[in-house]
């Protein structure tokens, strides 16, 4: 049975996640950042005979799912999702396979993309003076770059993306870095989420006209180095072999396999 979590359930959920929080990073970090009871997130547990089978955290148009044994009710999850404007489900690969295997595309068309979660503990120091923190005036260009990207952009609603980036930046939950040429942003990367001791780096993108010139490695190394110096664990998600190779060049090692379920109906689109 799925129950909505209350404030006094926080320690129960954290205990269930335990030290393997890298298997549900966004769920864990949003929980730490906002806390149960916040208007920003909704948190639920699937419980059976007083045992937790799964945890669900709703944030904007995403639901983050974590289950240790994938012994939860997909039918009940589907009913819960009907009450939320969900476009994506993020979870471990095995959980995505379990949900997808019990979710008919005739009910709601979807695609599943598999990838990896990786961590970096050390990065080679390189010359990267061109990397700088983004200014408020850069965000319009950043949103346009991300939304226009053939891989990254398809996971976002444009207005929601802009809202998330600005909100996270103002709250200190993320930092955006850019490389610019003549005041035009040609490369971007950010900490997509940060809490004490942990950060996720994400949204690495380079303008098509400037690709394969080393800018991706330059900005990726710079942001990783900056965050590692602060004593934080640094993680990243990726879904393509090209991105996988780039991460290995920088020094990332994989800690788990990942899955992203994207519903194809366009009711959320601009």
What is the meaning of each model-derived region?
Residues 1-26, 117-157, 269-270:
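Short amphipathic alpha-helix that is part of the acyltransferase structural core
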Residues 32, 58-60, 153-205:
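A conserved beta-strand-loop-helix scaffold within acyl/acetyltransferase catalytic domains
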Residues 42-47, 176-180, 235:
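Cytosolic beta-strand hydrophobic patch enriched in CBS
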Residues 59-128, 261-263:
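Acyl-donor-binding surface of acyltransferase catalytic domains
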Residues 71-77, 206, 212-226, 249:
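Conserved acetyl-CoA-binding loop-helix of GNAT-fold acetyltransferases
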